[in-house]
Design a protein with these regions (language model features):
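Short, aromatic/His-centered strand-loop micro-motif at the edge of beta-sheets
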Residues: 82
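Surface-exposed, interaction-prone regions used to assemble/regulate multi-protein complexes
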Residues: 85-86
């Protein structure tokens, strides 16, 4: 992860440790700042985001799909579709794919909402190494690399996966009776 860690989602804006906006969501579009790559001349990468929380779908199970906009993202060749979905009956364990990469996003405590992101084998079957931790903080979410050097989780994957967890773990829920 190239951005200065830890990152923090505050509402729909993700900022690095210096307070620089590195990603934001507006009207169903996730924008990842090109400067996150370390090159300030890089254009922003745009994703169309669809979730089960939008109300457009009738799915009782959580999912998030982030599809790169090929026509507006100059880096769209490198950007890949990302999907996050429930791995069981509850949102305790989420499975995710970003291109060919597979991840498990699991809560690290029974009653807590802190999560760890585990990079899985290519087929998604075996346990792998923890690459990041996500900790809810009020109405936001803190993202930190498990590896001090920050290697192991691409920045784009970290942004999309953490946004999915932000929706699940910090959004107020409407309980239907």
């Amino acid at each position: 992860m190239a951005g200065t860690m830890p990152w923090r989602w505050n509402g729909t804006t993700l900022r690095d440790a210096r307070g620089t906006d590195i990603a934001w969501v507006r009207d169903g579009v996730l924008t990842i700042a090109g400067a996150l790559s370390g090159d300030p001349t890089q254009p922003d990468t745009l994703f169309d985001v669809e979730t089960s929380l939008d109300g457009a779908t009738a799915s009782p199970r959580f999912f998030l799909r982030a599809s790169p906009r090929a026509n507006r993202s100059a880096g769209s060749e490198a950007a890949k579709q990302c999907e996050v979905s429930q791995a069981g009956l509850t949102v305790t364990r989420l499975r995710a794919t970003c291109g060919d990469a597979h991840y498990l996003l699991e809560r690290s405590a029974i009653f807590g909402k802190q999560r760890r992101i585990v990079a899985l084998a290519e087929d998604g079957s075996s346990e792998g190494a923890e690459v990041a931790r996500l900790t809810p903080r009020g109405s936001g979410l803190e993202v930190s690399a498990s590896n001090p050097s920050g290697h192991g989780l691409p920045d784009v994957d970290a942004v999309v996966l953490s946004y999915g967890c932000l929706l699940v773990d910090t959004t107020p829920r409407i309980v239907r009776g």
